[in-house]
Amino acid sequence: PFWARVLPQVKAAHPYSWIFGEVIHGDYPRIIEESTMDSITQYELWKSIQHALETENFFELDWNLKRHNAFLDSFVPQTFIGNHDVTRIASQIGPAKAALALAVLMTVGGVPSIYYGDEQGYVGVKQERFGGDDDVRPKFPGSPAELSTLGEPTYRLHQALIALRRRNPWLLDARTEAVKLENKHFVYRSTS
């Protein structure tokens, strides 16, 4: 495969690089092994976090967390709740549930990433048309002082959960298990 030929050269020249690929579906561990990438995007987890909070049915999320645990045996997935190709999480499930999605993202195994603007509670709906990404890819203001103060609580939550993550580096490869699972309630434990 192309990446298996190219990435060793990249890593030889840049030994501290960390390479991940955007993979929507497929055999994630096999793709990692054959490509020599360090990680890939964990779309299954993204979708199940969003869907569980949107429908208030946590069984899909529990199932995908079990799969996620299995992925962690082979590699550490790049996890997210928003990116450049999807409707923003605050638009999809509302700001309160977006905060819960962030809490899940930051308390399960993986390498979490934050899509720019999500830390400010940006909204935007992806549309299937020419220019349909424009709403989810807005221009940032010229300086932080120009940001709306409406995003301040979301920003502070991001700061707190990122700090939690930094204080607990074991979360990188933590395994997650259900403690209590019902349609509208899900308590889980992450351990390493």
Task: Describe the role of every protein-language-model region.
Residues 98-100:
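Conserved interdomain hinge at the start of the Helicase C-terminal
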Residues 107:
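Conserved active-site segments centered on acidic
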Residues 1-77, 95, 104, 123-160, ...:
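Active-site-proximal helices and loops of the catalytic beta/alpha 8
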Residues 178-192:
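Carbohydrate-binding surface patches
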Residues 25-27, 83-87, 120-122:
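Solvent-exposed loop/turn segments at secondary-structure junctions
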Residues 20-21, 111-118, 169-175:
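Acidic/polar loop patches that form or flank catalytic/metal-binding clefts of enzymes
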Residues 89-93:
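Short, solvent-exposed helix-loop connector elements
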